[in-house]
């Protein structure tokens, strides 16, 4: 069964933004046409499930679904930890997401290569003007 899912607690660059296509491709490589497990509690205003998507690691196709796709996006610098929604995460997930983003920034990977990457929420707001 196919469902539309928004990854909880991260925000990725929009299509028209730097790293938007790369972020989308990385996520697609992780989850497209794969069996995933989704831990969720709500839907967004567009009817999408908002949740944590767990998938098998590409390095171990016979392993259980133990790779958090949102955390994977953060670790390669292709998303922001969406602190606005941090309270909806478990304390453990908050800690992992914060750490992944901090480490990606320190390594200057993905969008953190740019001197001042524009968060997608600011990009969307600018598009409305």
Q: How would you label these PLM feature ranges?
A:
Residues 1-129:
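Small beta-barrel nucleic-acid-binding modules, primarily SNase/OB-fold domains
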């Amino acid at each position: 069964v196919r469902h539309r899912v928004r990854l909880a607690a991260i925000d990725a660059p929009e299509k028209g933004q730097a790293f938007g296509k790369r972020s989308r491709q990385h996520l697609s490589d992780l989850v497209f046409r794969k069996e995933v497990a989704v831990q969720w509690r709500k839907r967004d205003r567009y009817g999408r499930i908002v949740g944590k998507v767990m998938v098998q690691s590409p390095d171990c196709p016979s392993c259980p679904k133990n790779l958090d796709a949102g955390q994977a996006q953060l670790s390669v610098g292709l998303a922001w930890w969406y602190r606005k929604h941090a309270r909806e995460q478990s304390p453990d997930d908050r800690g992992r997401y914060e750490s992944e983003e901090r480490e990606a920034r320190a390594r200057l990977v993905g969008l953190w290569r740019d001197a001042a990457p524009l968060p997608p929420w600011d990009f969307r707001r600018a598009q409305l003007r």
